[in-house]
């Protein structure tokens, strides 16, 4: 009688463990499926930059380029555009953010995106220089990094490539923020991946 009770209890425990494993595994599969259906805009706008800020100047520019690619090549709602501009402004240094208030920045992005659309220009690909090509300097006690990026554009049946240099400054928390950026000429030092 005791042996039968122990066998039944053991079978019940094994069934409970198997059932728990199935439930946990099924929930994680569902969570993974939900993640897979997020658009690039949603992946960027749901990224918590307060907890997961990019660690290097290169990663900051890569994230900014993902945002730029969304601006000029994807469909988004006005609320998503607000969220995209919020994320971009979090990457900006205080000086750049002060010179680009959210409403002004959003209007500029909207006008540029419309201009690209009117001219049938698409941003086909972006690239950022290798980690070894990032230049670091110290200026008036501030750590500064220079990161080159490339933009492969398609207009009708023709293609062009432009280059920009991003200047980033490390803030008091150690985060790299975009201080400014400008168009540069292509040369052998500008090759990006």
Predicted regions and their residues:
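Extracytosolic low-complexity repeat regions of secreted or lipid-anchored proteins
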Residues: 46, 144-156, 161-169
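Core segments of small alpha/beta cavity-forming domains
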Residues: 40-120
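A mature extracytoplasmic/lumenal domain signature
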Residues: 103-105, 140, 149-153, 166, ...
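Short beta-strand edge/turn micro-motifs at domain boundaries
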Residues: 28-39, 159-192
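Surface-exposed, charged secondary-structure patches
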Residues: 109-155
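Amphipathic, hydrophobic N-terminal targeting peptides for secretion and organelle import
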Residues: 1-42, 193
């Amino acid at each position: 009688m005791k042996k039968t009770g122990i066998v039944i209890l053991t079978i019940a425990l094994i069934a409970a463990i198997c059932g728990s494993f199935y439930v946990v595994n099924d929930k994680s599969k569902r969570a993974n499926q939900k993640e897979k259906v997020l658009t690039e805009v949603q992946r960027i706008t749901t990224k918590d930059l307060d907890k997961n800020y990019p660690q290097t100047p290169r990663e900051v520019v890569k994230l900014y380029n993902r945002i730029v690619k969304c601006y000029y090549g994807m469909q988004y709602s006005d609320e998503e555009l607000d969220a995209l501009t919020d994320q971009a402004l979090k990457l900006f240094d205080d000086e750049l953010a002060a010179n680009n208030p959210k409403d002004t920045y959003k209007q500029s992005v909207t006008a540029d995106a419309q201009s690209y659309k009117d001219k049938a220009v698409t941003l086909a690909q972006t690239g950022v220089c290798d980690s070894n090509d990032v230049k670091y300097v110290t200026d008036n006690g501030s750590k500064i990094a220079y990161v080159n990026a490339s933009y492969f554009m398609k207009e009708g049946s023709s293609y062009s490539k432009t280059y920009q240099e991003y200047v980033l400054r490390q803030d008091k928390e150690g985060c790299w923020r975009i201080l400014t950026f400008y168009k540069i000429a292509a040369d052998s030092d500008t090759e990006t991946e």
